[in-house]
Amino acid sequence: MGRSLKKGPFCDEHLMKKIEKLNATGQKQVIKTWSRRSTIFPQFVGHTIAVYDGRKHVPVYITEDMVGHKLGEFAPTRTFRGHAGDDKKTKR
């Protein structure tokens, strides 16, 4: 289930303040955040946000297509190493 329309989208206040401050000064710098739950707003477009994946901060450049999604969607927490190889080829 998605979030109620009555409530509106969620974004951590500290992250929103940092973005608004950068937009006011016109600066572009990487913002470190642990807030994977925050929704991406149109004000974020053009900024790079380093989202924590549990081990390191993954830099995510925000584009228009990402608006409405969560920051955590773009910083995977699990590393996929691939499925087991096919043993049929090695037996021959």
UniProtKB/Swiss-Prot annotation:
InterPro entries per record: Ribosomal_uS19, Ribosomal_uS19_bac-type, Ribosomal_uS19_CS, Ribosomal_uS19_SF
GO molecular function: rRNA binding; structural constituent of ribosome
GO BP: ribosomal small subunit assembly; translation
Cellular component GO terms held in the UniProt record: cytoplasm; small ribosomal subunit
Domain of life where this protein originates: Bacteria
Alphabetically ordered keywords of this record: Ribonucleoprotein, Ribosomal protein, RNA-binding, rRNA-binding
Family that this chain belongs to: Belongs to the universal ribosomal protein uS19 family.
Function: Protein S19 forms a complex with S13 that binds strongly to the 16S ribosomal RNA.
Full protein name: Small ribosomal subunit protein uS19
Organism this protein belongs to: Geobacillus kaustophilus (strain HTA426)
Gene name per UniProt: rpsS
